[in-house]
Design a protein with these regions (language model features):
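Aromatic- and charge-enriched surface segment that lines or borders ligand/interaction sites
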Residues: 82-127, 140, 146-148, 246, ...
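Extracytoplasmic/peripheral linker and loop segments enriched in polar/acidic and small residues
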Residues: 344, 395-404, 431-498, 516
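Surface-exposed binding/hinge segments that line
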Residues: 29-30, 85, 96, 129-174, ...
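N-terminal lobe/hinge region of extracytoplasmic solute-binding protein
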Residues: 38-88, 119, 185
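Periplasmic-binding protein-like
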Residues: 47, 265, 290, 294-331, ...
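Structural transition elements
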Residues: 190, 320-357, 373-376
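Periplasmic binding protein-like
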Residues: 37, 106, 385-435, 467-470
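Aromatic-rich, solvent-exposed beta-strand/loop patch
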Residues: 89, 104, 148-166, 185-242, ...
Length: 516
């Protein structure tokens, strides 16, 4: 029975994603050349086990690969593994590895590398709790790797496909490297060339790449990947108008993060197109539940009461849609009716009542944001005005995105409220939310959420799993660990006369893409 339960989790996102990825016309691929991509910022680190930011992950998934990966519709598919067997009531997972896979340094990948990677992940990753229930590993031969868990986990394979904090396979030589100090040696189609942290990064074709020849084409992050490009140059350009100008003048082939107004400037230009992805991410206000004022749930709930979603969306100008839930409506775990009571409250009078109960006396509330993503900055600025209407002393701090992102994930920087977007958890389903739920709001202890996640992971009964997820979402929103803003879309611009093979996805992928 449990293998069926495992499969049921892997199919949760099909209804969401399928309409996005219709077949694209066949085009003639050409090999060679450099594609120039202008994005909002550069990565702080290329250690996959610590990577939760899109600007890091878009690069990381070109260099590194996982045992199982997301396909085009976000289901789990074998990647570095050729086969996965689940046994012992979903407590034993046996991975048969593809033979002949090489790292970018020419070394063949074996089960020793896989085991060393799992062991390093458990020591350094932000998402190390993924492996907290491991009893032992076995590597009986170079192409077999076995994970033994202490308890049933019906969603273990589903968790391994995650694109955030990905459990990629590194050479065993990296096992003892501290966090953020790993060498960029991967099995992916590209390898790191040049990296100037305030300017640009260049990926080069990995000549040692071993494609999965059992597949006809790439499929999400799985399947047959081909590096047609000699190189990809990532230019870090924080200003959206400057990115658009780079596309219009031919200095960039692809650009990130267009607002609706900027995207309209491409209308009527036959050589330039917009790549639209929706749903893409979900935007939230994140409240630091272990720091100062926002350690008090009454303060967090007061902040929730002032939020006027329409005013925020009007200010940001991004592609968006209202939705109170942590998931998208096609999901069988969607809890929109329950979540609605915590959404778009716009009730400053209620906020004042909660502030009085909390004993608030005009202390400074720090709102931290960044200048790289205008929608984040503008959201925080609008929120600060809404907070002031309720009598909250809001102090806005604008820093760079990578500092903002690191502070969000580490809890550093003395902030109370920030904002960001989460892309993979809403698409991939309830199990993927666990690391996000705990990491970003810095929840110290919440027994109700702990127990519900335990039921979600271990139960073989679908109604029980649904009830567990509804309990998690209800508690999470009630305690205002985060406040939902909206579902958001992505608008990217590209030169259609020069770029071929580019397909919509919530990450840009430059394998199986070429320049004409």
């Amino acid at each position: 029975m449990l293998p069926r339960i495992v499969r049921s989790f892997l199919l949760l996102s099909v209804a969401v994603a399928a309409p996005l990825f219709a077949a694209f016309p066949s085009q003639a691929q050409t090999k060679g050349g450099t594609l120039v991509y202008s994005t909002v910022a550069g990565p702080a680190s290329l250690d996959p086990y610590m990577a939760g930011s899109l600007v890091e992950l878009e690069i990381i998934h070109e260099i590194f690969e996982t045992l199982v990966a997301m396909d085009e519709n976000y289901n789990a598919r074998p990647m570095l593994a050729s086969k996965v067997e689940v046994g012992n009531e979903a407590k034993t997972f046996t991975f048969t590895l593809r033979k002949g896979v090489k790292f970018s340094n020419g070394q063949e990948m074996t089960s020793a590398d896989v085991q060393a990677s799992f062991e390093r992940y458990a020591k350094v990753s932000t998402n190390a709790s993924l492996l907290a229930d491991v009893e032992k590993y076995e590597a009986p031969d170079p192409y077999t790797f076995i994970v033994h868990l202490k308890n049933t986990n019906a969603v273990f394979i589903d968790l391994l496909k995650s694109s955030t904090y990905p459990l990629v396979v590194l050479p065993a030589s990296q096992k003892d490297k501290p966090a953020r100090e790993v060498e960029t040696i991967g099995t992916g189609p590209f390898k790191l060339g040049e990296w100037q942290k305030d300017s640009h990064l260049i990926l080069l074709r990995n000549e040692n790449y071993t494609a999965d020849e059992t597949a006809k084409d790439s499929d999400g992050f799985a399947g047959k990947k081909t590096a047609y490009l000699d190189s990809v140059r990532y230019n870090f350009i924080p200003e959206a108008n400057a990115r658009l100008a780079a596309l219009q003048t031919g200095k960039s082939d692809v650009i990130a993060d267009l607002t609706l107004d900027l995207a309209k400037r491409l209308d009527g230009n036959a050589g330039l197109s917009t790549l639209k992805t929706f749903p893409y991410c979900q935007q939230y206000f994140v409240l630091h539940s272990s720091n100062g004022l926002t350690a008090n749930p009454l303060i967090r709930q007061a902040i929730r009461e002032v939020v006027n979603v329409d005013d925020i969306l009007a200010a940001t100008g991004i592609l968006s849609q209202r939705n109170p839930s942590l998931l998208y409506p096609p999901s069988p775990y969607y809890a929109g009716d329950m979540a609605a009571k915590y959404y778009d409250r716009k009730d400053p009078a209620k906020a004042k009542e909660l502030l009085k109960q909390a004993g608030y006396n005009g202390e400074k509330l720090v709102l931290q944001t960044n200048s790289n993503y205008p929608y984040m900055r503008d959201s925080i600025l609008v929120l600060s005005e809404q907070l002031k209407e309720a009598g909250i002393n809001a102090d806005v701090q604008v820093i760079d995105w990578m500092s903002n992102s690191n502070n969000l994930q580490r809890g550093t920087g003395n902030w109370n409220v920030s904002t960001t977007s989460f892309c993979s958890p809403p698409l991939l389903g309830p199990p993927q939310w666990k690391s996000t739920v705990y990491t970003f709001p810095h929840i110290d202890k919440d027994p109700a959420i702990d127990a519900a996640f335990d039921n979600l992971f271990k139960s073989a009964d679908e109604p029980t799993r649904k009830a567990a997820w509804f309990a998690i979402e209800s508690r999470f929103l009630d305690q205002a660990y985060m406040i939902k803003v909206a579902d958001t879309g992505s608008l990217r611009g590209y030169n259609n006369t020069r770029v071929g093979g580019l397909r919509p996805y919530f990450y840009l992928r430059f394998f199986n893409t070429w320049v004409k």
